[in-house]
Every structure is written in structure tokens, then in C-alpha cells.
């Protein structure tokens, strides 16, 4: 599955196409990045929409254990997970500690999925892990499950398809 930058320039901040359609209640939806980061972040859906975005191809969502078809998911638009992490900056004490970092994505319901530094920054997984705020060209609200974490490089997307992403905790694992 290919992710392509939405705007021609990655530094473009002209996203009026998206912000004009947002719900004022989206300001209440907050995603936090915390833990071993230089700059802890608290982001609203509106803040996510203002960042450079990527889109992914539609996919079939299937149950991981039974392979039962759940539904076809239209293309997501959102921010690369790596871009959010890079924006917060990684904090570590010793050289090489970053290679032992994990990123725990946690939903409002407590469902949590991990990523390693190697997955996100040293493999194709990082090129296809997004925090989505739009699906099928329509903005997602909290009622729709926004923000949604999606890992497009996974063989089966369901286990790391997380609705109502609340926080991303960054940790350095002990040797």
C-alpha cells in the first residue's frame, strides 16, 4: 500500500480545504505525546489537520483471529506517526538508546498497540503508519473514532487499527 504526500510541498501549511469543514467540538479531541520526548505535545484534531498530510489506499478490514470481513475502509488522510514523533523529539540518555525505544499508542478505551523505533524509523512500517483525521474525503469526528491510528504495512490491519487514539507514550526499554 502506497502513501503519497497530499500536498506537493511537504512544508505546505495551506489546509483551508480541511479546516473549513471541522466541527468546533473537534477542539475537545486531544492527542498527547509523552514520555521520553523533548517536547511533550497536546494536539487537537484541528492541529492535526493543519500538519502536512498523506493518504492511503482503501483496504478491507478483517478480524485478525477469524479473518472475517468487517468492512471496506475508504482512503484515510492523516499525519505520519513518525512526523508526530519527530516533532516531539526523542529524549534519551546514552548514544544508541533510541534503538531501544518503543511507542505505545493507547486509545480512550485502554486498547494499546506498540511500535518499536526500528519498525517506524528503519522499515517500511513507518512510511505507512498514520494518525488519520479524514476518511473517504470526509472529516472524522470523535463520534467517528477520530483520531484513528492505522498501520498500512501490517499484513492484517485490524490489530493496529485503533480508533479514538488518546496518547502516544514513548519509552526507552532497559537493556
Specify the residue positions occupied by each region the protein language model found:
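N-terminal intrinsically disordered, low-complexity segments enriched in P/E/S/T
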Residues: 1-175
